[in-house]
Swiss-Prot record:
Name the UniProt record assigns to this protein: tRNA dimethylallyltransferase
Binding site for substrate: 10-15
Gene from which the chain derives: miaA
GO biological process, one term: tRNA modification
Keywords associated with the record: ATP-binding, Magnesium, Nucleotide-binding, Transferase, tRNA processing
EC number: 2.5.1.75
Lineage: Bacteria, Pseudomonadati, Spirochaetota, Spirochaetia, Leptospirales
Region (Interaction with substrate tRNA): 32-35
Residues bound to ATP: 8-15
Superkingdom as given in the UniProt entry: Bacteria
Length: 296
């Protein structure tokens, strides 16, 4: 069984590439932790209804902004989607920018305990330096496997430690994993690689096109669910909230939003470079490769 996978940083053209795939052969399984929200399609740059009508997308826009999902739940949904696609003789095409979700799906997850919402909320508010300091104090060995600047994983480890379980204990071995359960699968995995200057130009241009719609959807979500809902915690919406609250002007909003997307792209690239099942590929080469891939 062939399993095509394409990762890439924000702004790299992942969605546009899906538009050249044959919808009679492929369906897209999205691995994007931000595009799960139906209320926030603009700020998360989710595929448009027109793009989704060209080729079917799974795991896009299925949560309200007041709902949340974790990597384990996402992995189960992805398994179901892949089984459905294969049952109809099509090829599931895994696509997205959330490397953690992709890795968890393929290789499994650490058997971590359930973390109370209050603990998650507390850790979320901590500056990275404070979270790192607390983790070092409570579980020094945990930091041996974590980058000092990996805010997501540091805070995730701290959440677990605050439940009374050492991250250094539970992170020794993963359980589950689609690839581990199906070793016959042959992954054809790449991530879209652009010269950094061109990628940043693409990101800056994209930000200018989404700000109006992003502000409108932020207002709507605010009126429905309030400022603390999970959807508004995703990338960039803190700047939209700051602008709507009069804390920053429009120029600052645009500058900070663009910078946050560029920083996010840099983190995504760092993650993808570390994955042994993915290798860099240019956009044109990816089109050539994936449009001609054959299922076996």
């Amino acid at each position: 069984m062939i399993l095509p996978i394409l990762g890439g940083p924000t702004g790299s053209g992942k969605t546009s590439l899906t538009q050249v795939l044959d919808p009679k052969r492929f369906e897209i399984v999205s691995f994007d932790s931000r595009q799960v929200y139906r209320d926030l399609p603009v700020g998360t740059t989710a595929p448009t209804p027109e793009e989704c009508s060209t080729i079917r997308h799974w795991l896009i826009g299925f949560l309200n902004a007041n709902e949340s999902i974790n990597a384990n739940q996402f992995s189960l949904l992805a398994r179901n989607a892949i089984a459905d696609i294969q049952s109809r003789g099509k090829i599931p095409f895994l696509l997205g920018g959330t490397g953690f979700y992709l890795r968890a799906f393929l290789l499994g997850m650490y058997p971590v305990p359930t973390v109370p919402k209050e603990t998650k909320d507390y850790v979320f508010t901590l500056p990275l330096e404070e979270a790192r300091s607390q983790l070092l104090a409570k579980d020094p060995k945990a930091m041996e496997s974590l980058s000092d600047q990996d805010g997501y994983r540091i805070k995730r480890a701290l959440e677990v430690v605050l439940t009374g379980v050492l991250w250094s204990d539970v992170s020794k071995e993963t359980v589950g994993g689609f690839w581990k359960d199906n070793p016959e699968v042959k992954i054809v995995g790449h991530w879209l690689d652009w010269p950094r200057e061109i990628l940043y130009q693409r990101i800056n241009t994209r930000v200018e096109t989404i700000i109006r719609g992003m502000l409108e959807e932020t207002k709507e979500v605010l009126s429905k669910y309030g400022p603390d809902c999970p959807g508004l915690r995703t990338l960039g919406y803190n700047f939209a909230l700051a602008f709507l609250n009069g804390m920053i002007d429009s120029n600052t909003f645009i500058e900070q939003l663009a910078q946050s997307h560029r920083n996010y792209a840099k983190r995504q690239i760092t993650w993808f470079k570390k994955e042994s099942f993915l290798s860099p590929i240019s956009y044109d080469a990816a089109v050539q490769l994936y449009t001609n891939i054959e299922q076996r």
